[in-house]
A protein has these predicted regions:
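Helix-boundary and N-terminal cytosolic regulatory elements
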Residues: 1-129, 192, 196-208
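A short, ordered amphipathic alpha-helix with a cationic face
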Residues: 29-30, 125, 149-151, 187
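Short flexible/disordered coil segments
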Residues: 90-93, 118-137, 165-168, 227-236
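Membrane-associated alpha-helical segments
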Residues: 100, 142, 151-152, 158-239
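Long, non-coiled-coil amphipathic alpha-helical linker/lever segments
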Residues: 124-142, 146, 208-215, 219
C-alpha cells in the first residue's frame, strides 16, 4: 500500500500514486507499507532510488545502516517492537530522503507513522519545514520507544534480582539469566542505532538541512545514554 502526501503553495494534499509527478518546488512524503516490487518500481523511477537501496527496503531483514548515494540517502533501522516473555521482536523501518522528499518503508504497522497520517495539522507543519523534519520526527519517536523499553527491562531485572536475593531458587536464577540475555540483545540493537544516530550528527551533503543537526545530536545523546545504561547494568551483572 502506498500513501503519498505533497506540500506546495501552503497546502497539504494526498496524491493518487498513479498521478504522481515529481515537481521541484513541492515537498513529498511517500509511505510504503508492505509494498512489493511492482509498487516500488514507479517510485524508484521517479525518485532515482539506487538498486542497493531498493533491495534493502524490500527486505525485512536488513541490518541497521546509513548509506549516501548521489541522488539521495538511505537509512535502514532495526527497532524493537516489543518484548514477549524473553523474546525481542525486531522490525525494520527504512527511510530514503532526497532534496525535497522522504520515502518511508515498513512491513508492520507503525504507531508513529499512523499517528502522523491521522493528524493533518501536524503533518502540514512538518512538511512546511521540509521533508527532513518528518524523518527527524519519526526517528525521535523510535528512540523514545527504545528508551521506554529499556526502563521497563531494567526495572524488571532489578525486581527479579531482589527476588533472587530473598529466594535463591533455581527457577528464579533461570529467570534472572533469561532477563540478562534479553538485556544483552537490547543493548546490541541500541548500539547499532546509536552508531546510526552518530552518522546523522555530521555535516554532509546528505540532503538533510544543517539546521536539523542540533536536533539529531539530541537524538544521538538519548540513544547513547540508553546504550550506556544497558552496558552499565550488564557490567554490574558480570562484574
Amino acid at each position: 500500500m502506498i500513501k503519498i502526501f505533497s506540500f506546495s503553495n501552503g497546502k497539504l494534499k494526498e496524491i493518487d500514486p498513479t498521478t504522481l509527478k515529481k515537481e521541484r518546488r513541492t515537498s513529498y512524503w511517500i509511505d510504503l507499507f508492505c509494498s512489493n516490487i511492482e509498487e516500488i518500481k514507479s517510485i524508484r523511477e521517479i525518485f532515482d532510488i539506487h538498486p542497493a537501496a531498493e533491495e534493502d527496503i524490500l527486505s525485512n531483514q536488513t541490518r541497521t545502516k546509513y548509506e549516501e548515494f548521489e541522488e539521495n540517502t538511505a537509512v535502514i533501522m532495526q527497532g524493537i517492537k516489543e518484548i514477549e516473555e524473553f523474546n525481542i521482536k525486531i522490525y525494520n523501518l527504512s527511510f530514503i530522503f532526497g532534496e525535497n522528499y522522504l520515502i518511508t518503508s515498513h512491513f508492520e504497522n507503525n504507531e508513529a507513522i499512523d499517528s502522523l497520517i491521522s493528524n493533518p495539522k501536524k503533518l502540514e507543519n512538518l512538511m512546511k519545514k521540509g521533508a527532513g523534519h518528518i524523518f527527524h520526527y519519526l526517528l525521535d519517536k523510535e528512540i523514545d520507544k527504545c528508551m521506554q523499553i529499556k526502563s521497563i527491562l531494567l526495572e524488571e531485572f532489578k525486581q527479579t534480582e531482589k527476588e533472587f536475593i530473598k529466594n535463591p531458587e533455581k527457577e528464579v536464577l533461570e529467570d534472572l539469566f533469561q532477563k540478562e540475555l534479553t538485556l544483552l540483545e537490547t543493548r546490541q540493537v541500541m548500539e547499532s542505532l546509536t552508531d546510526l544516530c552518530l552518522s546523522l550528527t555530521r555535516p554532509t551533503d546528505n540532503y538533510l538541512d544543517n539546521e536539523l543537526l542540533p536536533y539529531f545530536r539530541d537524538i544521538y545523546d538519548h540513544s547513547f545514554r540508553t546504550t550506556e545504561s544497558l552496558k552499565s547494568m550488564l557490567g554490574r551483572i558480570n562484574g
